[in-house]
Amino acid sequence: TYDNRYIETLWWLLKQLYNKNLLYKGYTIQPYSPAAGTGLSSHELNQPGCYRDVKDTTVIGQFKMKNPKPEMAEWGTPYFIAWTTTPWTLPSNVALCVGPKIDYVAVQTYNAYSGEKMTVVLAKPLLNMHFNPKAAELALEDYKPGDKLVPFKVVGEYKGTDLVGMEYEQLLPWVKPVSVDEKGNWTDASAQAFRVIPGDYVTTEDGTGIVHIAPTFGADDAFVAKAAGIPSLYMNNKKGETRPMVDLTGKFYLMEELDENFLATCVNQELYKNYEGRWVKNAYDPQFTVDGKYDEKAAQAAESLDIFICLNMKADNKAFKIEKHVHNYPHCWRTDKPVLYYPLDSWFIRSTAAKDRMIELNKTINWKPESTGTGRFGKWLENLNDWNLSRSRYWGTPLPIWRSEEGEEICIGSVEELYNEIEKSIAAGFMTANPYKEMGFEPGVY
């Protein structure tokens, strides 16, 4: 991309795609590297070594029901319980997702930390993962805080569809989900949030069979939330930008960075002040990068925001279980630091439009070994997503899309075309000089 001839070739290719309606601007949840300051494509994440096993603090959160079924309210406080490997996303929770065909149970028990009586709902196939079968015969009334075995009793069974529509209280009410009208006024949208919604992607392989939904930090979350009419939880900063609770550098917004009207209307400042400015992952904190070198061991040894949130949830009786968990997590190939899934404006090539044709053509290729074509490459084609082209880096090829404030748009396919469009702009009085002409540059002559 340091050669203008190469850049012009890409411009020509992009214009061919644009003319075929295969190039578009979208607002989607994408892999994003706060350390590099740019979005990443699925191809970049699939490079060897990008996915690594990491040990994180996880939590099963307790979401207090608003409208429990009668049998759920007979013993203590009724909760839905949901597991997450990213506790820092819990303040952005706006829904819980269940599998419509999955079997769920209501269980009378105690919170192992606080000793509180409670009734929890989780997937039936995961019951023995979270409750010791030996405790099933114990009397609930005989339990004393600190006992190793916590008694439990199943008092109800349901399909996921039976739970859809049930409501719960916001787990960490730091910020309200909002909608904004044409005049820029913020309106509390909590009435449309904090309910159980269906999702076919929910499994019973791990967790509780109930998925915590934070649409601003997950593509699946955003998809099911949109389908169910669930609002997302956004911040409005002083630049007039609408962003998630986490900024582009990977930290919770400072209150001084937020729009004053939004701050006064939508933020519980007393709760939020304990978390503002905190890095969601230690890897993003500048103190762990000295002279351009990232000290991963020091970052891992320091207390993380996840631990801080989990301990506060435990103290507030909002945590059912806290534990360490090893899982596979994507990292940026440029910085070796973990990525986030983040909503970004980007330009995409509509690769999915040619998906079936590419799968068909792949079958005609004589792969050596054959497993490469049917395996890694074939599976990649089957799970193909539209190609995210946008990168926030100065050394990349500038995308040749020009758009007016009124939404008019043009795609430039060559330097000659750009030269001519500048001449039109000068004639119309929008520009005073053609920088190409002033430099003596002739299109096509390098």
What is each model feature region?
Residues 12-16, 60, 64, 308, ...:
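Alpha-helical scaffold segments in soluble metabolic enzymes
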Residues 2-16:
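Active-site periphery "cap/insert" segments of enzyme catalytic domains
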